[in-house]
Structure formats: C-alpha cells, structure tokens
C-alpha cells in the first residue's frame, strides 16, 4: 500500500502548491483601467452635483474652499509627458480630497445638516480614497515624489468653491476630465 500512497501524496502536495503561483500568473487587470470602475465614481459625483444643484439657494459653505481648476487645454495636455500628467492629476486629487474633508467639517458645524448632503459628502470621501488607491497602481504617486523636471513643474491652477454645488461640480468635472484623460493614456501605454 506504500507505493500507491506516494503518488497520491505528491498529487495532493502539487495541488496545494499550484495556487501559490496563480496570483502571479492570473493577476486581475488594473481596476482603474476598466472604464466601468471610473464611470461608477463619475456617476456618484454627478449625482451629488445634481442633488445640490436642485436647491435654488443651494447649501452654501461658510467659507470658501480651494479646489483644483478642471479646465483642460487638450493641445497642451496631449503634449505633456504621462509623468507630468500624473503629477497634475495627483496634486488635483489631493487638493480635492482636502476640499471635501474641509466641506465635511464645515457641514458638521452647521446647525441642521441635510442628510442627503452628508450622504454625498461621505460617498465623495470614500470615492476619493478608492481612486487614490487605484492611482497608486499606475504609479501616479511616484511621479509626484520625483517629477520629470522639477524646474518646469507648473503650480497647480486653483479656484474657490463657495457652495456645495460648485464643489461637487468641480469634483465631477475633475473625474470626467483630467483623471479620465490621464488614466486612459497611462493604461494605453501600460505605465505603472
């Protein structure tokens, strides 16, 4: 009986060891490169913008909040290296995250915060954290640490938001604009 048990033991051991190599061989594609993932975050941002746009007076912020400028000069953008795009997107995403957190703090200090507004703020915070993690896979954070040419790195253009509607509009436009352009190009090139 000793002879038949050896092949069974070897088969069992090989079956146990095979899955150790599977994560490397069958790694899931980078999630940020799946357009449906980014579209989900864009949809959430657009919903938040629509909810706050519905209020005629709109929930106002008690102080102005600095947000990234979302305008894109497509000619200049296409001429930028992907590393430069990464720096601009990472800086914009960081500033947007700070702005949403600041808005959350201002909302918490208001007398009667609307529940739906708080829900969208929470979703935005969660979405920005997820997007930040997904961008790390593309190496956007590494580019921020060592920009291609620090002397030519232009300062991030900003503007101010005084209402939640404007804040969520900037959030939505940033995701649909610079973030989508950068991830599309980085995924096409296979950059990490």
UniProtKB/Swiss-Prot annotation:
Residues 1-26 form the signal peptide. SUPFAM superfamilies: 4-helical cytokines. It is found in: Secreted. Glycans are attached at residues 50, 64, 109. The keyword Iron does not apply. One of its GO terms (molecular function) is protein kinase activator activity. Disulfide bonds join 33-187. Keywords: Disulfide bond, Erythrocyte maturation, Glycoprotein, Hormone, Secreted, Signal. Its main location: secreted. GO terms for cellular component: cell body; cell surface; extracellular space. It comes from the Eukaryota. One of its GO terms (biological process) is negative regulation of apoptotic process. Produced by kidney or liver of adult mammals and by liver of fetal or neonatal mammals. Hormone involved in the regulation of erythrocyte proliferation and differentiation and the maintenance of a physiological level of circulating erythrocyte mass. Binds to EPOR leading to EPOR dimerization and JAK2 activation thereby activating specific downstream effectors, including STAT1 and STAT3. Belongs to the EPO/TPO family. This is Erythropoietin.
């Amino acid at each position: 009986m000793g002879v038949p048990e050896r092949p069974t033991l070897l088969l069992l051991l090989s079956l146990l060891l095979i899955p150790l190599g599977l994560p490397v061989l069958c790694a899931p594609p980078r999630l940020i490169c799946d357009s449906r993932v980014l579209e989900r975050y864009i949809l959430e941002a657009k919903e938040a913008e629509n909810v706050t746009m519905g209020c005629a007076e709109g929930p106002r912020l008690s102080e102005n909040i600095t947000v990234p400028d979302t305008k894109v000069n497509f000619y200049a953008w296409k001429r930028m290296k992907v590393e430069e795009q990464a720096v601009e997107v990472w800086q914009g995403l960081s500033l947007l995250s700070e702005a949403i957190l600041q808005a959350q703090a201002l909302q918490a200090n208001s007398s009667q915060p609307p529940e739906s507004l708080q829900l969208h703020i929470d979703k935005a915070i969660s979405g920005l954290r997820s997007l930040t993690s997904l961008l790390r896979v593309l190496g956007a954070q590494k580019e921020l640490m060592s920009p291609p040419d620090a002397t030519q790195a232009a300062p991030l253009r900003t503007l101010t938001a005084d209402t939640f509607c404007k804040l969520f509009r900037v959030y939505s436009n940033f995701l649909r604009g610079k973030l989508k352009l950068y991830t599309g190009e980085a995924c096409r090139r296979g950059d990490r």
